[in-house]
Regions:
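Short, flexible helix-loop junctions that flank or precede catalytic/ligand sites
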Residues: 113-130, 134-503
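Poly-acidic low-complexity segments
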Residues: 13-19, 52, 56, 98-103, ...
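Long, low-complexity, intrinsically disordered polar/charged segments
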Residues: 34-43, 102-104, 109, 325-330, ...
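Beta-strand-loop-alpha "switch" segments that mediate conformational coupling across diverse proteins
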Residues: 69-71
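Polyanionic, low-complexity intrinsically disordered segments
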Residues: 1-65, 74, 83-86, 107, ...
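Charged, low-hydrophobicity low-complexity segments
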Residues: 12, 16, 74-126
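Exposed alpha-helical structural elements
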Residues: 4, 15, 19-22, 76, ...
Length: 503
């Protein structure tokens, strides 16, 4: 068996060496392809199959350099992967003395892998590492009769990345996660929630863990909260989130009011907190005192006092908000209004001269009113405090690298009431992993309350009447805003149907 790089690559372009920094071990294992680098930084992928154009484009995009392809034997690729095992280290059980919530911060990097680490630990490490490389928001480990299926949520859409063909390994994966999150590994009949941290290339990343019993064992969902992701992407502004000119102007106007409440609503993962961060970053001048309470603090804002919720120690949203109001704030951000007590305090704060920002889980801007009514709050106080509600969704953007003009069928145009537009559709390439989409942007509807709308809501008018009044004032629905994005070529009719409701 030939196991030397020189046996597979041109000697005149050498000497060759394996590079697990530019093409990490986790990716090499997943695709069964290693990166060899020769003289003059010449790069070649050694793989056990014929050239995969999509994978090659993806690697070239990652490295921002041309990459060649060379097929090698399965035995040789396995040998090269084994040689790279020492270049992938993860998850050392060392408590981080600097953490403020008394959990464990572990290390995950592409420098070395402990030789003593079990195969299950290495599998979990590789899965987490891959998720970070793919900028996934969630990792799903779903138990099956044969083992487990591992899926990532990338740009809001699920994709299968691994199959575990062993029920025992699947069980050990979940047990390992429980240990990391300091949960009860013996409890398999009840749901459990926890969190853990990893330090990756010098930055700290939070993970929320949810364990749920299922027919074939326990399923795990890991939410990834990368505080440094926004900083790496550039300045945090409303402009960077993809809002239209009118939406940005309206949000900025509401954010500069002297008092009241601005709420952002939408499902989990719709960018609510990011929108609030961008809003605070824009209005922060140093002249006002801004305090936030969050679960967790996802992004650190310079000059803003940020408090992490710690329910184990009794620091809840409601208790933290009460304390914040004694610290003479001008503007307050509450990460989420989850219960009646927090809602009541937020409303009172808005009525007593503070500008309050928060998020609420609701399907649209109008449903927020129903949520507060369901909590038992005085509706007159709610509408008196409330300045505006922003409901938003994230739609995937058509990949700029493979987008082509597209003519929808007549039935689609008729159904959406569209005559023409600049319709584009991605064909799929290495930049977008074959999906036709790359990146996301926000679409939103903004309900701005005036005296007329407040009177209708306080009088408990039918929702249809309230919606008609808002539309008469120029409000555009989520569906209308998403349709406008389709007609501009930013996204597709499929995304429109996926993220908005045809009301």
């Amino acid at each position: 068996m030939t196991t030397s790089l020189a046996d597979w690559l041109p000697a005149e372009q050498g000497p060759w060496h394996l590079d697990f920094e530019q093409w990490p071990q986790a990716q090499a294992q997943r695709w069964r392809a290693v990166l060899a680098v020769g003289a003059d930084d010449r790069r070649v992928l050694l793989a056990e199959r014929d050239e995969d154009a999509m994978l090659l484009q993806s690697v070239e995009s990652r490295l921002n350099a041309p990459v060649g392809w060379q097929r090698a034997s399965t035995e040789a690729v396995t040998h090269f992967l084994g040689a790279g095992e020492a270049d992938f280290r993860a998850l050392s059980d060392v408590e981080d003395a600097l953490t403020t919530i008394e959990d464990h911060t572990e290390e995950l990097s592409a420098l070395a892998l402990s030789e003593q680490a079990s195969p299950v630990v290495r599998l979990l490490n590789a899965t987490i590492y891959d998720a970070l490389q793919d900028t996934a928001s969630d990792i799903h480990i779903e138990c099956t009769a044969r083992g487990a299926m591992i899926r990532f949520r990338v740009d809001g859409v699920m994709a299968v990345v691994r199959q575990v063909e062993s029920p025992q390994v699947a069980e050990q994966l979940v047990s390992r996660l429980k240990v990391m999150a300091e949960l009860d590994i013996g409890e398999r009949r009840l749901p459990q929630d926890g969190r853990f941290k990893l330090r990756v290339q010098g930055r700290e990343i939070d993970f929320r863990l949810s364990i749920m019993p299922s027919v074939f064992g326990e399923d795990a969902v890991i939410r990834i909260l990368d505080r440094a992701a926004i900083a790496r992407a550039g300045a945090l502004t409303l402009d960077s989130l993809g809002f239209g000119d009118d939406e940005r102007a309206a949000i900025r106007h509401q954010a500069r009011q002297p008092h009241g409440m601005l709420l952002v609503t939408g499902p989990t993962g719709s960018g609510k907190t990011t929108t609030l961060y961008a809003t605070l970053a824009e209005i922060h001048t140093g002249a006002d005192k801004i305090i936030t309470i969050e679960d967790p603090v996802e992004y650190q804002l310079s000059g803003v006092v940020q408090i992490p919720v710690n329910e184990k120690k009794g620091l809840t949203f409601s208790r933290g908000l009460r304390s914040i109001l004694r610290h003479d704030p001008d503007r307050v951000m509450v990460g989420e209004i989850r219960d009646a007590e927090t809602a009541q305090i937020a409303v009172q704060a808005a009525l007593t001269g503070h500008l309050v920002f928060s998020t609420v889980h609701a399907n649209n801007a109008f449903d927020v009113i129903g949520r507060f009514m369901h909590m038992g709050l005085d509706l007159y106080n709610v509408v008196s405090a409330l300045n505006a509600v922003l409901a938003q969704r994230l739609v995937r953007l058509t990949c700029k690298h493979c987008a082509r003009p597209f003519t929808p069928d007549a039935a689609t145009l008729t159904r959406h009431g569209v005559i023409n537009g600049n319709f584009l559709k991605g064909e799929g390439c290495g930049h977008c992993r074959g999906t036709g989409y790359k990146g996301r942007r926000a679409v939103a509807e903004l309900l701005k309350l005036d005296d007329g709308l407040r009177d209708l809501i306080a009088a408990r008018a039918p929702m249809s009447e309230i919606k008609a009044a808002a539309k008469a004032r120029g409000m555009k629905s989520l569906r209308e805003m998403a349709l406008a994005a389709v007609c501009r070529g930013d996204t597709t009719f499929e995304e429109l149907e996926r993220v908005t409701l045809d009301e």
